[in-house]
Amino acid sequence: MEILNTRRMMAIGLAGLLALRAQSCLKSYVEYFDDSSASRLSTYLSDLDAMLGGEQYGWRMEYFVGNEDGDFGGINIALKFDNEKGEVTAMSEEEKEGAYTSLYVLTTDSGPVLSFDTYNPVLHKYGTASAEYYEGRGGDYQFFIIGYDKENKVVNLKGKRNGKFCNLYPLSQPIADYNAKMFEINRNFYVSTFDGEIGGQKVTGDIDVRNHQFTAYEMETYGTDKDGKPLYDIANTITVPYILTEKGLSFYEPLKVFGTEIESLDFNFNLAQSDTTFRSASGVSFKGHIPADWLPYEFFAGTYSLMYGTTFGTGITINGIELIPEEPGVNFRVKGMSSQFDLLMDYNIRTGRIELRYQAVLRPDLDEVVIDNDQYIVVLLPWELGPDSGGLWMNPDLGMAAKWNGDRENPSFTWVDNGGSKRFSTTSFLLYYYDTDETADSPYYDSAESYSFTGGNYQLPYLRTFRKTK
């Protein structure tokens, strides 16, 4: 029997076993325990450790997250275990190239547990508390081991905190190659609505690509219009979390619509620029559609005028703002909003919109951030400005998106919250100092009042419109 080091086998002899039962509606989970002896448990964990570390390319983890703040669906995480060092390297489909190595341990806590017990930006992202999510976003980094199958190479896990079931499957390529592929699939999947029929009954739905939620509406007729065509209303709503796969998407639990259960849907990723057909193994077919106001990256380069309000309700217009391609397909450098700095606007390929988000401002024409006294970085801070108060958050997901008016000849955009948070709605921005001193009581230092936007000051309240002039 392979002997694990003391740290990674701590407390095994002291714990009992917990017979964890899998939910029948989920994937099949096989239990392997037939006695509670410390010897058998030690062997069980030793064999699992060898299995994890012995896989040539590593593992794909179906990582599902969510709590009372909302369900955030499934994320593909690529893992490579080094069972000699007790280390794991993790990559997420949400980040193209970042690979992070930390420690893991096989132990017990009311049953056998796989614990990622040192901080890892990928594995702890959704389970770490923040100012916005006080208990994290329902992610786990400790998992009950429900079972594993050496022959079929699958490991079944259940989150200790959120109770979500997760699977580990072996990869057929290095984790960097797999992650790069899933990053592109994740980035290019922006179908927002769908429709179709099941057994002659009409189905429509929405896809929340940010939070990986698939919502189907069972439709019923309630009459006809003047031309005799049926009128429909929603009879029932079904929402299930999903995770993307190399072929399409897979549901956390079967999607049950008009008595038909659908476990997964395949679709062609090459159809990103047009309507997409979803197909299930049982022959169910849905037609997916991209957002009506979706625009390609190339559309946005040009010159603009921006109008924003002030705290007194009047409007200020900044003319001659230029959007210059920075990283193709990803973002634009914004010039003309200030003589003291440049900004970046991100392109969200899922929504076909440009977004202004939290960021460190840049020195004009350079890739260097603006910093005062070698300590205070000037940042553009999302601001939830209201009639009586205003909240500030340092979160790179937060910001505002430019919603197109649908006119290609005279394109104009309305600024709206980008949906980066379920708790916070950005209406404005201001310039602030971020204190890099780790001993400071707070990274929020003070307003950066020595910096200003063209024709105004350090505040950018109530963004209104963004009009393309050429």
Predicted regions: what they are:
Residues 82, 107, 146-148, 324, ...:
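Short beta-strand micro-motifs enriched in acidic
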Residues 2-4, 26-113, 156, 162-164, ...:
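Acidic/polar, low-complexity intrinsically disordered N-terminal segments immediately downstream
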Residues 87-235, 239:
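Long, acidic/polar, low-complexity amphipathic helices and coiled-coil-like
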Residues 7-15:
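Sec-dependent signal peptide recognition
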